[in-house]
A protein has these predicted regions:
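N-terminal auxiliary segments of SAM/dcSAM-dependent transferases
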Residues: 1-59
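Residue-level signal for inorganic ion chemistry
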Residues: 33, 89, 105
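Class I SAM-dependent transferase core
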Residues: 57-95
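Conserved SAM-binding loop of SAM-dependent methyltransferases across substrates and taxa
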Residues: 108-120
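Short beta-strand element of Class I
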Residues: 123-126
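Single conserved hydrophobic/aromatic residue that forms the stacking wall/gate
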Residues: 129-137
């Protein structure tokens, strides 16, 4: 259950789109992986099904039950588990080899590695994650 204060604030911000926001919490979670084009130029023969993510050149949806993080190809770095929506910024930025990139929201690093792959390893990608505070529990 989401906190009521949060829901009240979101209802005010989203207006007529608020019901769609709530409905999204009832749908299954969407999970994705991204091929590491610096290590492979073809899709590996995976033991689980995938489907292309329309907005991500090397992005693929997979069934969360597949557990691709346990596969040796993940350990070898042929693909990176990444939230599908997090793949969009690097696609929209359209970086080119030789450019310089600064990623200020780089935790845990998926976008930074995606940008480096799009630059074909040519050009620096500097990354950090700024936090006003961190709480450990």
């Amino acid at each position: 259950m989401l906190p009521l204060a949060f829901l009240d604030r979101i209802r005010l911000q989203l207006g007529p789109e608020y019901p769609a926001f709530l409905a999204a919490y009832d749908r299954p979670r969407a999970v994705g992986l991204r091929l590491n084009s610096l290590k492979t130029d073809r899709f590996p023969n995976l033991p689980f099904s995938t489907a292309p993510i329309p907005w991500a050149e090397h992005g693929f949806w997979y069934d969360p039950q597949a557990r691709p993080g346990l596969h040796p190809w993940h350990e070898a770095g042929l693909y990176y588990l990444q939230e599908p929506s997090a793949m969009a910024p690097a696609e929209l930025l359209e970086v080119q080899p030789g450019e310089r990139v600064l990623d200020l929201c780089a935790a845990p690093g998926g976008k930074a590695t995606q940008l480096a792959a799009k630059m074909q390893g040519q050009g620096p990608v500097s990354y950090t994650h700024l936090r006003a505070h961190a709480t450990l529990s």
